[in-house]
Amino acid sequence: MQLVFIRHGLSEWNALNLFTGWRDVNLSEKGVEEAKEAGRKLKAAGFEFDIAFTSVLTRAIKTCNLVLEESDQLWVPQIKTWRLNERHYGGLQGLNKAEAAAEHGDEQVRIWRRSYDVLPPVLDPKDPNSAHNDRRYAHLPADVVPDCENLKVTLDRVLPFWEDQIAPAIKAGKRVLVAAHGNSLRALAKHIEGISDEDIMGLEIPTGQPLVYELDDNLKVLSKRYL
């Protein structure tokens, strides 16, 4: 069984070196090209999909659409869920990473970005840019909408969707594409690959590169490769 992950193409804020998180930022021109090229690679390699899963953030949705369009599969059903959103970077969202490092120190910012269980500063729920003020999350209980997350909390958010939707689809023989974000995909990778809390700090998933997993019947990883 195969599973394909793709992190969204380079976003406008990736290009500006800003913390993005749940802020809804568009793809950059380079990101659009990355997504299109990913679709062409998948088509050339003969990949066909039965279902696609993505987040409710524009950069991932557009990446999913472009990948499917370039591989002549735009008709494939898509399920969008907040559970595949990027990790919520709390009060860091919108800040320049270099400026944050200058203010808080390189090591503190590295820990905020890469550690498994250290939380970043909390974003005030009353902030105009808080997800509490975004109608795409209006159906969620207020205590479910995050104000900041680490990777552990992100995994706790993503895992129920993996178990309820993605894993059953794979076990049913469906060919699955997951177009999401660096940290939601890192969380899923940690789970399916059995990566330790320490080693996950070193895992980087590049933008716009299809990551192909070969899985056994129990969804254990047999191999992984980038196209």
Curated annotation (Swiss-Prot):
Catalytic reaction equation(s): (2R)-2-phosphoglycerate = (2R)-3-phosphoglycerate
Binding-site positions, substrate: 7-14, 20-21, 59, 86-89, 97, 113-114, 182-183
Pathway annotation from the record: Carbohydrate degradation; glycolysis; pyruvate from D-glyceraldehyde 3-phosphate: step 3/5
One Pfam short name: His_Phos_1
Residues annotated as catalytic: 8 (tele-phosphohistidine intermediate), 86 (proton donor/acceptor)
Domain of life according to the entry: Bacteria
GO molecular function: phosphoglycerate mutase activity
UniProt-annotated site: Transition state stabilizer, residues: 181
Family recorded in the similarity comment: Belongs to the phosphoglycerate mutase family. BPG-dependent PGAM subfamily.
Descriptive protein name: 2,3-bisphosphoglycerate-dependent phosphoglycerate mutase
